[in-house]
Amino acid sequence: MSTSHATPRILVIDADLDAIETARFALWRSHTACRFEWFDDAEVANASLLTQALCRSRDLPALILLDPRKFPGTEGYELLRTLCVYQQLAHIPLVLFTESPLCSDFAQEQDSRIWYAAKPALAADHMDLVTRCVQKRLRQPEFH
């Protein structure tokens, strides 16, 4: 197995390039061992992930951080649908960012496939949230 396949792939999908760069910097600063990849276009991300699923790629993301709200129309939600419907993608853990006051903030005790988190307005808080989400996921048994 090559080193690139042994290193967990973290995929951020967000229309906000600043949020993507903040996440990248947070993981770099925390020395989190991962391959950071991103899309700022939900349709392109959807096509890429769907192609990987249909080709039965073994190099799927270990975790996807997605903010579906800022994409035009329903693109972000169509991507979310793809991630939930296709069997090859349905096992990938997701962190969905939302501004809804009804969402539960990411907490250490959450253990479901989909985590919900209110996206912090401050970059430092966003960096902390991304780092905690990714590190918690990478500590789970399936990655050891």
Regions found by a protein language model. Name each.
Residues H31-F36, D40, A90:
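A generic structural motif
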Residues L94-F97:
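Hydrophobic/aromatic residues positioned on beta-strands within the core alpha/beta folds
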Residues E99-P101:
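Short, conserved "switch-loop" micro-motifs in signal-transduction and mechanochemical regulators
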Residues A107-A118:
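As written
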Residues M1-L11, A15-T32, C55-L60, W115, ...:
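Non-catalytic signal-transmission and effector/linker regions of two-component phosphorelay proteins
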Residues A42, R58-L83:
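Conserved phosphotransfer microenvironments
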Residues R24, W38-L63:
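Acidic, metal-coordinating helix/loop segments flanking the phosphotransfer/catalytic sites
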